[in-house]
């Protein structure tokens, strides 16, 4: 099982690396073609796409959990297919509702929230309404992708995600070079959602066609809706806490200043979203093995160490060389205000990567209600941190608030998983200790050391992580994953 999950995770990571590479190439071109202000608006549109987890009311994730657990229990594929296609129909219907809502709210967002006027306001309004038209297609696509993940078709997903990533960024870049109008650039981004839907529904129909005469049971539909209902709370609050800071900043600062926050955030989030991508492979496996604690322990132990040895060296190197990398990638004037933002965000992104483990564990066991309640608890705390942080430290304060909120989220998730999963307590406690050591090393190297000593210790930590990663790969290939413990 661990070997299969590792292979699925590698396919996911490969697809994500292609997407990251395309984004790294596309953003400087968009900055040159559109300017900082319009690029800031484009990143806000990307933030709205990040709210797709809200729009689908948690049903795509519910499909992943339901499909994997049902097939693991030997349920009929015909019954599973009937449920899947019914839920995808519901998702398309929800998409029409959200289309109308965003179309109606777009003038308010442009005028009141973003405080735009003139040509910029016209372009942004056009782009937001184009984005609204794509929502039904996007939601149907997320349902199909969630089902394919439940079927553990990660190789198929990754192979198709690679060319689709080229289209997702390539089409907006092409439009920006021809016509530097951010409205049309966002419309190009929206058009790619239609292509995504056609692709994923075609693949799903090939693997899980609906059989005539077979209908979804009320019990299965009720379970999916209940799971998705609680998950929709997390999917509302989760993206809100990830992306609300940029909209709050947009209400206080001009778009060019917001870009100093959103560009490093989006880039760092994509660069370190590989663990989250890997967790997409872990989630259906945990749902399938929920009745076998020893198998879950092995999977989580492997995933815990993988997060530390793969993510820590990345965030550490980027933080140490943040100013140089931003200057080379964009320009020196942009690197100045963006560097402290990026460094603070990186430690938060590391903790967020580690928090996906208990999050996936709780949801694989059907406890989406607990993750939702934790997010409800965190939301007012984050709101206070954001307002106070921005008041005292400006854009850098937003990065500090986000990182502190992520640290709280990780602590609450690990404690909740430890409290509920008695057979996994020792493994979870060891994992938390490992995370504390990793965070201490990051803070020491980035903020306490300078010059040659900083570079030497960075090199030592990167080398140690590489050695540990190679050892993990060797053990996994040999099938001796039981030896891997945090």
Task: Kindly give the residue locations of the regions a language model identified.
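Helix-loop junctions and terminal segments of transmembrane helices
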Residues: 57-73, 149-150, 208-209, 264, ...
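Hydrophobic alpha-helical transmembrane segments
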Residues: 129, 158-206, 227, 376-382, ...
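Interhelical loop/hinge segments that connect adjacent transmembrane helices in multipass membrane
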Residues: 1-5, 182-183, 200-242, 281, ...
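Interfacial segments at transmembrane-helix termini and the short loops linking adjacent helices
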Residues: 106-130, 301, 318-350
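Membrane-interface junctions at transmembrane-helix termini in multi-pass inner-membrane proteins
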Residues: 135-161, 183, 204, 346-377, ...
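N-terminal membrane topogenesis motif
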Residues: 1-23, 78-89, 122-124, 152, ...
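Signature of the first transmembrane helix
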Residues: 4-69, 95-103, 134, 169, ...
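Transmembrane alpha-helical segments of multi-pass transport proteins
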Residues: 126-129, 378, 427-483
């Amino acid at each position: 099982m661990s070997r299969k999950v590792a292979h699925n995770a590698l396919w996911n990571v490969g697809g994500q690396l292609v997407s990251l590479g395309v984004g790294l190439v596309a953003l400087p071109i968009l900055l040159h073609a559109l300017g900082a202000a319009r690029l800031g608006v484009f990143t806000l549109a990307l933030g709205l796409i990040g709210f797709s987890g809200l729009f689908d009311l948690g049903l795509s994730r519910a499909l992943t959990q339901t499909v994997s657990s049902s097939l693991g229990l030997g349920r009929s594929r015909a019954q599973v297919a009937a449920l899947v296609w019914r839920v995808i129909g519901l998702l398309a219907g929800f998409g029409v509702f959200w289309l109308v809502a965003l179309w109606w709210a777009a003038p308010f967002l442009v005028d009141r929230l973003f405080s735009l006027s003139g040509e910029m306001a016209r372009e942004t309004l056009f782009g937001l309404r184009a984005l609204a038209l794509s929502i039904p297609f996007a939601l149907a696509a997320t349902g199909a992708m969630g089902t394919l993940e439940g079927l553990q078709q990660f190789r198929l997903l990754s192979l198709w995600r690679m060319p689709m990533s080229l289209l997702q960024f390539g089409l907006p870049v092409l439009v920006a070079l021809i016509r530097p109008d951010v409205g049309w650039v966002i419309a190009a981004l929206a058009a790619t959602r239609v292509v995504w839907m056609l692709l994923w529904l075609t693949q799903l129909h090939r693997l899980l066609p609906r059989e005539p005469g077979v209908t979804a049971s009320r019990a299965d539909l009720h379970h999916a809706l209940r799971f998705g209902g609680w998950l929709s709370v997390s999917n509302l609050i989760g993206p809100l806490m990830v992306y609300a800071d940029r909209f709050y900043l947009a209400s206080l600062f001009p778009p060019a200043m917001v870009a100093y926050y959103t560009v490093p955030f989006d880039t760092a989030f994509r660069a370190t979203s590989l663990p989250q991508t890997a967790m997409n492979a872990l989630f259906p496996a945990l749902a399938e093995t929920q009745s076998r604690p020893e198998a879950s322990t092995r999977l989580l132990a492997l995933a815990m160490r993988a997060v530390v040895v793969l993510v820590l060296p990345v965030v550490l190197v980027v933080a140490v060389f943040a100013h140089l990398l931003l200057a080379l990638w964009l320009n020196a004037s942009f690197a100045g205000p963006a560097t402290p933002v990026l460094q603070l965000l990186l430690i938060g992104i590391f903790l967020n990567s580690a928090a996906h483990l208990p999050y996936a564990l709780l949801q694989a066991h059907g406890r989406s209600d607990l993750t939702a309640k934790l997010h409800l608890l965190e939301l007012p705390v984050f709101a206070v941190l954001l307002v106070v942080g921005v008041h005292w430290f400006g854009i850098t304060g937003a990065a500090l608030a986000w990182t502190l909120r992520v640290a709280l989220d990780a602590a609450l998730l690990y404690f909740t998983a430890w409290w509920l999963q008695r057979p996994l307590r020792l493994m979870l406690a060891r994992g938390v200790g490992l995370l504390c050591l990793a965070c201490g090393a990051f803070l020491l190297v980035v903020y306490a050391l300078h010059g040659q000593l900083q570079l030497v210790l960075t090199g030592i930590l990167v080398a140690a992580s590489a050695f540990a990663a190679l050892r993990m790969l060797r053990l996994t290939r040999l099938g001796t994953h039981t030896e891997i413990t945090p």
